[in-house]
């Protein structure tokens, strides 16, 4: 059976963009038989094997349920087509049947001699292999909760609970460059008069408090992707005045995009798919922790896990220089927005300000 694939059959995201190049390089323009799109790139799996080689490494980490140990939790198994959709974000979620047809066409030889891999629930055997985990797990405790508790109550600065070499490697896969002139925003509650551009930057050391990416006394410039994001993040009340500063980047920088730490493409050259797969739970935890809502009543200790991750990113050196200028993470308060935490506040300059009055706030609630 010939299955033709176009780039609209995939979520064009951080995971799947590496698939698009072979599709476009060895494709024809036509109408897709799956999604019915017109005049798109079509890839013939009968003629080319580029995608076959790309998927082979990923599929090799899975074992059909019939070959897994009896002790392997059945709840941790599911069909391969579901894994590709939900664990790896490779294909869109409209039709599992289409995904099945696509993957069996791409990997037709593997399907011929190992149909169980495609037709039975599958699992990753190493998830419960203590010897493998001891050598490849991001957390030596094998528990995010134990790691957080240790940071808060035992040893904050010289912990051995994290494989820092592995964390650095994961960070290298989510590098994000910004060019000189890039614009971000910062908001502060103010009076009707507003705050001058020269005072819109990071607070001085003696006024620096604990934040998501910095400990008390360590300066850090927090910016948002839009003025709206920064206003939401400020949590201003109804009838407050806020000053929004427009900040311009003064030189090229590279940051770690923690929004993508759990969306690393399995097709990146050099990535160990198995090692990444067994650590996805912890990477999801890092992503969740960066996006965790903090309440006024919460303890500053609740910032410690993200401060630890941020301080490590800040410490990464390459060729005698700091590798990363900051971290990027999703906005807690504004869906779809994101924030940038800069280790050096002087990398950006506030070039103009606007004063806004907050007219109304739309409160939403639920019973707890």
Task: List PLM regions with ranges.
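Active-site and NAD+-binding cores of ADP-ribose-processing enzymes
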Residues: 1-181, 186-214, 237-368
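A short, exposed loop/beta-hairpin motif centered on an aromatic-Gly-Thr core
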Residues: 217-223
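Short active-site loop/helix that positions an aromatic residue
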Residues: 227-238
